[in-house]
Structure formats: structure tokens, C-alpha cells
A protein has these predicted regions:
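Histidine-rich, glycine-flanked metal-binding segment
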Residues: 1-5, 11-55
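Divalent metal-coordination and catalytic microenvironments
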Residues: 9, 29, 49, 60, ...
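Acidic, glycine-enriched loop/beta-strand segments at the rims
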Residues: 11-23, 418-425, 429-431, 475-480, ...
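Short, glycine-/Ser/Thr-/acidic-enriched flexible segments
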Residues: 31, 38-39, 90-91, 197-199, ...
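Di-metal (Zn2+ and/or Mg2+/Mn2+) metal-binding site signature of metallo-dependent hydrolases
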Residues: 51-75
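Divalent-metal coordination cores built from histidine and acidic residues
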Residues: 69-191, 227-228
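Active-site neighborhoods of metal-dependent hydrolases
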Residues: 133-137, 143-145, 149-156, 162, ...
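C-terminal cap of metal-dependent C-N hydrolases
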Residues: 433-440, 445, 457-459, 509-555, ...
Length: 571
């Protein structure tokens, strides 16, 4: 008897080839039959009229902390994702000496906007080394599959202590780090990650440890993986355009050519008004790198990356005197004060204290430390997930009110009102150009990070609803391949990403006509009551992970069949 049969579905198998109708039989966590299945099964799913596809794979997340308290793997799980890779950009929770645990947590808060109180309340910190961290993840109950990099900043701090934040590594330091990378890869690390991004800073506003490293150190650490013929090098790139970015990319190509290891960087993105637009240079660079013999990938997402503001999380004005006083109150009392004409006048007048807008990224958290006057022509009052929203500036002109008054009115009418400020990828045709490039990977949700600032976890359902259904820029078969097989191949997950006999039974069942993300809302559901943005999806009927039904119509079944996925160098 089979464990599970998905009957009457239309299979989009991840290869990019045409769809077909068939049943899928599952036993012992594997796909064992595809066709007209007559054998009985303990469970059956009727997928008539629905698509059956491989589970989606997200290679750029920061779920390192969240996996400790969230069995379901939200929000990724609601968008058809069955496998995530964490430890990106050099940020990880291991290796870490016990005395430095809070410092590591504070760094994740500073860089990735993961609330400190959630980490302190939600992590039962049982590990010190990276292999011990993997062993902990392996034992945790989890609905999804997890793989992880060993992170450069964590490794550097572990070996060098506070010297890691200001000094080049000595030969002895590098030798110790090389051994740790080899140990991690043998234990199952997907590879080694780092960051050179100027936006990545510590709680003291100094560069994270990986940004201090000289290239000879990076050469040695990626070279350690080359000696084992295993492991991927992922790096958060130099984000400025121009000579600095080009020098970084040229050096990165040399690492790929010298070591032969796969190298990933990103996200590749486009910024409105930037000339020349660096994303085009990066795509050309990928072509040149591949032609030279490098194994090189750029990561990109399917939509704009946004700062999201809401009454229940951050607002651009939170550091201003009268706003600070009001925002310290419970939401109901905030609304009462905001409705008071005298208080409203003070809140509006406070906006004049804000610094002029500049070209620096203005994410949600930055509102509390470095307030900049919003560009109301680029701040949207979100009404639906189709992104056809009015700007605050247009509403202010229409109503004859100050933009701050308009925002207050909208929040009083709906305390869940969300405002969206695109940071990059404002040009949708530019995004399409990136998605169509043969050496980009459709990933980079950043799930688990920026939990009150951004909402990238919906990229998979956005791909299906916007780029496939609304824009018809991809066939469903093409889009599913980008979310499944292409990512499985890049991360060397050799038994996932296709609906094939013998492959792991990671599957998603969805309605191609209705699948889409829902509106984001703010929930106080993190450990310690910390808040985050939550975005679910419609149109996903079921998700199977290693043969067990993990979700039915978006609701968790309680099954926790997720596994720790190990890299190809695992002993």
C-alpha cells in the first residue's frame, strides 16, 4: 500500500517541459509511481483541476534563528516553499562561543532586523561549533527542509574575537578558519557565505566582520572548499554602483576561476534614476564570467524590494518628539491621540524636523535612528496585492491635505493600513530582464529577516500570479522550473526540484487561476510578543514535504517531516 496518492492532477514537473495529467504515488518519503495509479493508499488528495509541481526552493533566507521556535517555517511555507537555505551573507548563529551569544544576536538584529527579544526568548542555545548547530537543526521538529552555510562574520568572530571587527586576519587566524570551513562542509554545510555590502553594519554602526577581511582570506576559505571539491560560495555584494562594484565583481570572478567552486552573489537589482543602471552591467558580467569558465550565478527576486510602514510596526516619523510620545502607547490609545486635532497638528508640524531625503536606503528600522523626510511621490498606500496603489502625494493633492494628515486618516480608518516605499526594482520591465537572464536564480526572499521592514517571502506566489497570469511573461512551466529545478541544480540538491520517480516527495498542489499572495498584516506572534509582518497566500491547496502532508489549504497539519539537507561534502 502506498502512503499517499495525489490523483487526477495536472503535473508541471519542474523541467520546463509541457504539462500532463497523471497521479503521483508516494511511499517512504519518495515519489514511487507516476501515471494511472490503481494501488490503494493510506491518504489520497484529489487534485482534479489543480497543478501538481515540485515544492519551491528558496536559496536566500535568514531563518537561522526562526527555525528554533517556528516549526512551520512561516511565511515561506504559505507560498509553496518546501526547502530553504539559511546562513546567507555571512550571518549565522554558529560558530559562536557562549560568552558572545547575545552579541551575535544583536548583530542579527542590527543587520537583518530580527527582534532581539524574540531571539533571546525563542532560542535554546545548545551549540558552539557549526557542526553542533547543524546537529541541533537536524533534531528540531520542522515542516520544511533546511540547509545552511557557515557564515564568515560568525566564523571570523569565533576565531579572532573582537579583532575581527577591525584587523586583517593573521596567517594563524586564516589557518584556523580554513579548518573550521572544512569541518563545516564535512558536517553538511551547503558552503561558505560572506558579505561586502556597505549596508551591513554592527550594533555600533561599524562594518560587520566579513567586510574587514582581505581578499587573501576569502581566497583561502573558498579554496578550502575547493580542496574538498564541495561547497558553494555565496556573498552579499558591494552595493554601490560604479568602480567599487566593478572591482568587487572582477575580484569575485577570479575567486570562481581559481577555485572552481560555484559562486553566487545578489541580489541583482535596479534602482530608479540610476545611470548607468548597474543591473545591466551585472548581467553582462555574468555572461562574461560563464564564457571564461566560471560557475557563477546572480540572485534576484520577482518584484520591488520595499520598506513597509504600518501603525503596528514602524512609521517614518517614529524618532520625532511628538511621534515618539504617541507611539509609545497601545494602538487603541495611539488612534485616540491621532484623532485629536491638537495632537494631529503637532504630529504634522514634527515632519519639518526631518532631514532631507537622500540616496541612502531608508528601510523601516532606519526610521527610528536616522529619520528622513519621505518622498511621498514614492510612498504608496497599499490597497491590494496587485500594486496598483495611489501614492500618498496623489491622495494629499486630491484631498487638499498635508501628506502626514492623509497617512493619519488612512490609519484611523484601518489600523492595518500598510504603506509601501520601493527601495529597488521599481522598474518592472527591468525586473523581467533580470528574471529572464539564464544565469540568474529566482530566489532572495530574505525570509526570517527584516521582519517588520520588508515582505519578500511571497516571491513565489507573486511569480505565479503576476509574471505568469497577469503579465504572461512566462509560461507556468517556465516559472515553475525557475522556482524548483533551477534552484535545486544550483544548490546541488540532487534529489529535489523535479516530479520524478525516486525523487523526494516535496510537492505543492495549487490552482493556477487563483494562486496569489494576500495583503501583509502585522502580527505579534514572535517569542516574547515581538511583532513582524505576515503575508499568506490563496490558491495553494496542499503542500507535501518528504511524503507527509504539511499544509492543507494554508493550514498546518502538524506534520514535521522536514529534514536537514546536507551539502555534497558531507561525510
Amino acid at each position: 500500500m502506498l502512503d499517499l496518492v495525489i490523483r487526477h492532477g495536472t503535473i508541471v514537473d519542474g523541467s520546463g517541459m509541457g504539462r500532463y495529467r497523471a497521479d503521483v504515488g508516494v511511499a517512504d518519503g519518495r515519489i514511487v509511481e507516476i501515471g494511472r495509479i490503481r494501488a490503494p493508499a493510506q491518504r489520497s488528495i484529489d487534485a482534479d483541476g489543480l497543478i501538481v509541481a515540485p515544492g519551491f526552493i528558496d536559496g536566500h533566507t535568514h531563518m537561522d534563528a526562526q527555525v528554533n521556535w517556528d516549526r512551520q517555517g512561516t511565511c515561506s511555507c504559505w507560498h509553496g516553499v518546501t526547502t530553504v537555505i539559511m546562513g546567507n551573507c555571512g550571518f549565522a548563529l554558529a560558530p559562536c562561543p557562549p560568552a558572545e551569544r547575545e552579541w551575535f544576536a544583536r548583530c542579527l538584529t542590527a543587520v537583518e532586523d530580527i527582534p532581539l527579544e524574540a531571539m533571546l526568548a525563542g532560542i535554546d542555545w545548545k551549540w558552539e561549533t557549526f557542526p553542533e548547530y547543524l546537529a541541533t537543526v537536524e533534531q528540531l521538529p520542522k515542516a520544511l527542509n533546511y540547509g545552511s552555510y557557515i557564515g564568515h562574520s560568525a566564523l571570523r568572530m569565533y576565531v579572532m574575537g573582537k579583532r575581527a571587527l577591525s584587523e586583517p586576519a593573521t596567517d594563524d587566524d586564516i589557518a584556523r578558519m580554513v579548518q573550521a570551513v572544512k569541518q563545516a562542509v564535512r558536517a553538511g554545510a551547503m558552503g561558505f557565505s560572506s558579505s561586502r555590502a556597505g549596508t551591513h553594519v554592527t550594533p555600533d554602526d561599524t562594518p560587520v566582520a566579513s567586510r574587514i577581511a582581505e581578499w587573501r582570506e576569502i581566497d583561502a576559505l573558498v579554496g578550502a572548499m575547493a580542496e574538498l571539491d564541495a561547497g558553494i560560495f555565496q556573498v552579499g555584494p558591494e552595493v554601490s554602483s560604479g568602480p567599487a562594484q566593478r572591482a568587487f565583481l572582477e575580484r569575485l570572478r577570479q575567486v570562481a576561476l581559481d577555485t572552481g567552486r560555484p559562486v553566487m552573489f545578489g541580489t541583482i537589482s535596479t534602482r530608479q534614476g540610476e545611470a548607468p543602471n548597474s543591473y545591466r552591467y551585472q548581467l553582462d558580467y555574468l555572461d562574461q564570467s560563464i564564457a571564461a569558465g566560471a560557475r557563477m550565478f546572480g540572485q534576484t527576486t520577482t518584484k520591488s524590494i520595499n520598506a513597509i510602514f504600518a501603525l503596528k510596526s514602524y512609521l517614518p516619523f517614529d524618532a520625532l518628539p511628538h511621534w515618539k510620545e504617541v507611539r509609545a502607547l497601545p494602538v487603541a490609545e495611539q488612534k485616540r491621540r491621532m484623532a485629536d486635532p491638537a495632537v494631529r497638528a503637532q504630529l504634522v508640524a514634527d515632519e519639518d524636523r526631518m532631514k532631507p531625503r537622500d540616496k541612502v536606503f531608508q528601510g523601516g528600522g532606519a526610521a527610528t535612528t536616522d529619520p528622513r523626510k519621505p518622498d511621498y511621490t514614492n510612498l504608496f498606500a497599499m490597497r491590494d496585492v496587485e500594486w496598483n496603489d495611489p501614492t500618498v502625494a496623489s491622495l494629499a493633492a486630491e484631498r487638499g491635505k498635508h501628506p502626514v494628515e492623509v497617512m493619519l486618516d488612512l490609519m484611523l480608518a484601518n489600523e492595518d493600513q500598510v504603506f509601501v516605499q520601493p527601495l529597488v526594482n521599481e522598474g518592472r520591465d527591468d525586473v523581467l530582464d533580470m528574471l529572464r537572464h539564464p544565469w540568474t536564480l529566482t530566489t532572495f526572499s530574505d525570509s526570517g529577516a527584516h521582519v517588520c521592514q520588508e515582505m519578500g517571502s511571497s516571491l513565489q506566489t507573486h511569480m505565479l500570479s503576476y509574471w505568469v497570469r497577469a503579465r504572461q511573461a512566462f509560461t507556468l512551466e517556465q516559472a515553475v522550473r525557475k522556482l524548483t529545478f533551477d534552484n535545486a541544480a544550483a544548490w546541488e540538491l540532487n534529489d529535489r526540484g523535479l516530479v520524478r520517480k525516486g525523487f523526494a516527495a516535496d510537492l505543492v498542489v495549487f490552482d493556477e487561476h487563483t494562486v496569489r499572495p494576500t495583503m501583509p498584516v502585522v502580527e505579534a506572534d514572535l517569542p516574547g510578543g515581538a511583532r513582524r509582518l505576515v503575508q499568506k497566500a490563496e490558491g495553494i491547496a496542499g503542500m507535501i514535504v518528504n511524503g507527509k502532508i504539511a499544509f492543507e489549504n494554508g493550514v498546518a497539519t502538524g506534520a514535521c517531516a522536514g529534514q536537514l539537507l546536507k551539502g555534497t561534502g558531507a561525510a
